[in-house]
A protein has these predicted regions:
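A short, conserved, highly charged catalytic patch centered on acidic carboxylates
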Residues: 1-117, 128-163
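Carbohydrate-associated surface elements
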Residues: 123
Length: 164
C-alpha cells in the first residue's frame, strides 16, 4: 500500500487528462492498464506483476492479455488462487459513469462468478457494483452501483477504498 505513489499517479493523470480524452490521440485501454490501472492496483497492495513469484495457480492478480474482445474480465483478484473480485478496465475516453454497456459487462462477470462486487474503472472513475443483483434489460450505469470514486478522491479515501 503506497499512498505517495498513488498521489504521483493522480498528479500525472490530472496533468495529461485532456490528452487521454482526445480521440485523435488514440490512447487505448492497454496503455491505460499499463500506465494507471496496474499501478493503482499495486498501490492498494495487489501483486499485479507477481513479484512474490507465486505459482501461476496462486497468483494474486490474473491479467487478461492479448485480446480486443474478450469474454473474461481484465483482472481477476484472487486469494490463495480463489477468484474473489474482478476488475474491468476501459480507456479514459469511455464515459463509464454514463455508458450502460461497460456496466452491464462488468456486472455480468461478477454475477456469473457469484462474486459480491465488481470494479469497473478507466482510472478517472472507479465504479463498484453490487453483483448480487442480476443484470437485467433496461438497467443503466447506475443500476446496482454501490460506490463511485473520482480519481481525485483516491488518496483522500484510500482507507475507505482499501477496506472494500
Amino acid at each position: 500500500m503506497d499512498l505517495d505513489r498513488l498521489k504521483d499517479l493522480i498528479k500525472k493523470y490530472r496533468e495529461n487528462m485532456k490528452y487521454y480524452h482526445d480521440t485523435k490521440n488514440a490512447y487505448n485501454e492497454t496503455e491505460c492498464r499499463d500506465e494507471y490501472i496496474n499501478p493503482l492496483l499495486e498501490c492498494f497492495g495487489w501483486d499485479v506483476q507477481n513479484v512474490q513469484g507465486k505459482l501461476p495457480q496462486y497468483k494474486e492478480v490474473v491479467v487478461e492479455r492479448f485480446s480486443n474482445y474478450s469474454e473474461r474480465p481484465d483482472y481477476t483478484l484472487t486469494l490463495n488462487g480463489v477468484s474473489k473480485l474482478f476488475v474491468e478496465a476501459k480507456k479514459p475516453s469511455v464515459d463509464i459513469v454514463v455508458e450502460t454497456e461497460p456496466a452491464i459487462q462488468a456486472r455480468k462477470y461478477g454475477w456469473n462468478a457469484n462474486h459480491a462486487m465488481v470494479i469497473l474503472t478507466n482510472f478517472e472513475d472507479m465504479l463498484i457494483y453490487d453483483t448480487t443483483i442480476k443484470p437485467a434489460p433496461g438497467d443503466n450505469a447506475r443500476t446496482a452501483l454501490y460506490r463511485k470514486y473520482y480519481f481525485e478522491e483516491y488518496a483522500k479515501k484510500f482507507d475507505e477504498i482499501n477496506a472494500l
